[in-house]
Amino acid sequence: MYKILLADDERIILDGMAGIIEWESLGASLIGKAQNGHEAYEKIVHKQPHIVITDVKMPGMDGLELIKKVSAVSPSVQFIVLSGFGEFEYAKEAMKYGVKHYLLKPCNEQQIISSLEEIIAELKRQDVHKKKTAHLKHELDHIRSFAADQYLEGLIAGVAQLSPPPSLAGKKIRLLILKGEQSIDAAAREALGSALTAVCSSGEWTVLAVEENAAEKVAEVFADRKMAISQAGELRHAGQLFRDTAEASGDLHGSAVISKMIRLIADELGNPNLSLKWAAKDMLFMNPDYLGKLFKQETGEKFSQYVTRVRLEHAMKQMKIRRDVSVSEIAEEIGFGDNPKYFSLVFKKYTGLTPSEFRRKQGGASAG
């Protein structure tokens, strides 16, 4: 049903048009009436009619002002303009805004119906065209998606390809590698949207190519799946990205990942930003929740507990052999930043002694 709105300051004309025309037989419905331009505009904005039949002369805001204002916000709205004799200048002005139907008062029922039929026929043609265009776009997207999937599969399998599909040439991506041949459901595809470039299966893995800046979105969508994410690179290098990531991740839940995390902790011990989230997102490109569970499973400790323990054991060692170095310097070196008081609290909780007491017990002077 096409929605119609009437606007005329003369109540008799307004009610007459509303009652005399059989709207449903035209495939239309009358959604409202207005007696001035301001009221008509408000109803157009809120009810979104397809067609507005309006008088030219109305109080407050006339028909031409109404057409101008509506054209700026809803250019698809079609108008039928009613005017009195000798108002041709109004007609010329209305035509500038695409108005094709201009009826001279007094007009009869058939004239209005004829104008409505012409507009509705045109709207139907537009609807058919939109549907055809949407269908063709869907088909084209499907073809492009299939081509992208085939291209990715060839790269992962090591099959030489002359060139990628034109839409993917030079595209930067990350590979998301999921353990197991699991299909990507419609909800996941919809959540990733345009960030999803291609999908394929390779042995025991499902591989997705996603836009390089989509790592966070991917982690959210697949939070409950065992996965690894590659470094960023061009799609044409997907084969190497896949091999590097699969090798580094082992079976995506084995000790290879944890070994990499432990090496990372040792290398970044002095980094105050060292955290599970930072390591997962910026260094390992994996889901932090999954990585945290995996770390606890493999080591028996939470990531944060492990980091604190390693830092404190390193601090104790340094306090023994570097007796001339202050506690605050050692605290900063192992990632506690410029916060020696917090270091002292953590140190005492772990050892039962303050740093000064620990040093005295070791037989060394206390450096501040």
From Swiss-Prot:
Q: Does the keyword Phosphoprotein apply?
A: yes
**SMART domains registered for this protein in UniProt:** HTH_ARAC (SM00342), REC (SM00448)
Q: Which GO terms describe its biological process?
A: phosphorelay signal transduction system
- Superkingdom of origin: Bacteria
Modified sites of kind 4-aspartylphosphate: D55
Q: Which UniProt keywords apply?
A: Cytoplasm, DNA-binding, Phosphoprotein, Transcription, Transcription regulation, Two-component regulatory system
Q: Which residues form the Response regulatory domain?
A: 3-120
Q: Which Gene Ontology molecular function entries are recorded, alphabetically?
A: DNA-binding transcription factor activity; sequence-specific DNA binding
Protein known as: Uncharacterized transcriptional regulatory protein YesN
**Gene this chain is encoded by:** yesN
